[in-house]
Design a protein with these regions (language model features):
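Transmembrane-helix signature of 12-pass secondary carriers
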Residues: 2-292, 298-301, 307-381
Length: 381
């Protein structure tokens, strides 16, 4: 679809006359700020692995006295929220704008981080894990689009790839902070004032590591089956413990959430979103903020290309055949099928199980809680 000469002249005149909509921001700075959302994605999905061993501790020791079913639900509520967020995130960004959507998500990330940190019980934890999951899913649908629409063609692939890099960096950061916080606390410990069980099993007044209590379970070679073990723990008179270490692990992701909220407000909106709303002058002003004339050349051709693409998208939308257009176009169909295949394979590898529960699995393999939390860092690397 060619552009009439008169429209080209209008585009050229608009590019010349329209000033930047704000201070110039390099595409590197824009990517660094936007992918804080990706970093939060990775941190919030990975941090729970180190928090779970502490969450299992009794309430008086600082934990939430989790059961295995509740442990699974804590991971599941985040995934349910992520599924809903992924579906609605694109709708939100189409309606309000990519930048505006990321600003909202930064607030949701912060709310979820603080909510999980100060959860008094597991049911409140469920609610805020769902909130975090929504932010995670919506970020996965918004951040890559924002990067792709703002990046110049010459480095678009590299810029969008930063999204995935920051996700795994967030997971590595979560595993590393878990290990550091665990080491600072000396591993899960509790102080027992008395043991009201008929058979003390060697547990009397004093300070014990949580591993010593866990070793009483039949699944770890101890004498107590599931219900017997839970009854034994309930009959312990606990003075205190360091189980609240999990709160420090969870609260740390509030820092990048605040940084994202501040940083994204200094960045321009997507020029392509402006064009979709018919705001051509705003699109030109936004492009001028993130383009380097010496490296990216004049904006006339880019704006013209964006207008042509937008016109095609509108035609397909009005004809109601957007999906049919993708399916009939060989290279688009191939991209879609490859993307679906990779997404399915990625999930069937069981990577989420390792990410959430590796420390628990390693404990059953004979490692101490502290060693298993530290070993999880290798998974992040």
């Amino acid at each position: 679809m060619s552009t009439p000469p008169r429209i080209r002249e209008d585009i050229s005149r608009m590019v010349d006359e329209t000033p930047p909509s704000g201070k110039h921001r390099g595409i590197g700075a824009l990517a660094a700020v936007a992918t804080l959302g990706s970093l939060l994605f990775g941190y919030d999905t990975g941090v729970i692995s180190g928090a779970l061993p502490y969450l299992y501790m009794p309430h008086l020791a600082g934990g939430l006295a989790l059961t295995p079913m509740q442990e699974g639900a804590i991971g599941g509520t985040l995934l349910i929220g992520a599924a809903i967020g992924a579906v609605t995130g694109g709708i939100m960004s189409d309606r309000w704008g990519r930048r505006h959507n990321i600003t909202i998500l930064a607030v949701i990330f912060l709310l979820g981080a603080l909510g999980t940190t100060f959860s008094p019980n597991v049911f409140v934890m469920y609610v805020f894990r769902f909130v975090l999951g929504f932010a995670v899913g919506a970020a996965s649908a918004t951040v890559p689009v924002y990067l792709a629409e703002n990046a110049p063609k010459r480095i678009r692939g590299s810029i969008v790839a930063i999204d995935q890099l920051m996700i795994v960096t967030g997971q590595l950061l979560a595993f590393s902070m878990n290990a550091i916080i665990n080491a600072a606390h000396g591993g899960p410990q509790l102080i027992i004032k008395a043991n009201n069980n008929p058979d003390s099993l060697g547990i009397t007044k004093g300070t014990y590591s949580w591993d010593q209590i866990l070793a009483l379970q039949a699944s770890k070679g101890g004498p107590l089956e599931g219900d017997q073990y839970r009854a034994f723990v309930e009959n312990l008179v606990i003075q205190s413990g360091n189980g609240a270490a999990w709160r420090w692990m969870l609260v740390l992701c509030s820092i990048p959430a605040i940084a994202l909220w501040i940083g994204i407000r200094l960045m321009p909106e997507s020029a392509r979103w402006y064009l979709a709303k018919g705001r051509v002058a705003d699109a030109v002003g936004a492009l001028k903020r993130v383009r380097d004339p010496q490296k990216d050349g004049p904006l006339d051709a880019e704006v013209e290309e964006m207008l042509v693409t937008q016109q095609r998208e509108l035609e397909n939308k009005y004809q109601g055949n957007a999906f049919a257009h993708v399916w009939r176009t060989p290279w688009l169909r191939k991209l879609m099928l490859v993307g679906i295949f990779l997404a399915i394979v990625n999930q069937t590898t069981g990577v989420n199980t390792v990410m959430y529960y590796a420390p628990k699995v390693l404990e059953y393999a004979g490692m101490t809680t502290s060693a298993s939390i530290t070993a999880q860092v290798a998974n992040g690397v």
